[in-house]
């Protein structure tokens, strides 16, 4: 019997520093349900003047956010276990390869 794995991804963005009228960060999808072992990606699109860094966090229920990655320039990639983060000029992706039940959490992106 296949186990259903629910990974909650919430549309939440954190803007560190001053927010101008044109700065925006959008995370999608809002929620994602995966079967164990089924890979997928989260998208974090941004329009920010003078990006100094993009951050990915993971938050388990009832706990504070846990830092995963910081990306500074387009083309940069970082990997940790089943997670891989990539950055382009306008968006970042968090790829989850072969997720397990313990990967169920809220994943957040933030820009500075």
From Swiss-Prot:
Residues 1-21 form the signal peptide. Residues 23-112 form the Ig-like domain. It holds the Pfam family V-set. The keyword Transmembrane helix does not apply. Gene3D superfamilies: Immunoglobulins (2.60.40.10). Coiled coil: none annotated. SUPFAM superfamilies: Immunoglobulin. It comes from the Eukaryota. It is found in: Cell membrane. Glycans are attached at residue 43. V region of the variable domain of T cell receptor (TR) alpha chain that participates in the antigen recognition. Alpha-beta T cell receptors are antigen specific receptors which are essential to the immune response and are present on the cell surface of T lymphocytes. Recognize peptide-major histocompatibility (MH) (pMH) complexes that are displayed by antigen presenting cells (APC), a prerequisite for efficient T cell adaptive immunity against pathogens. This is T cell receptor alpha variable 20.
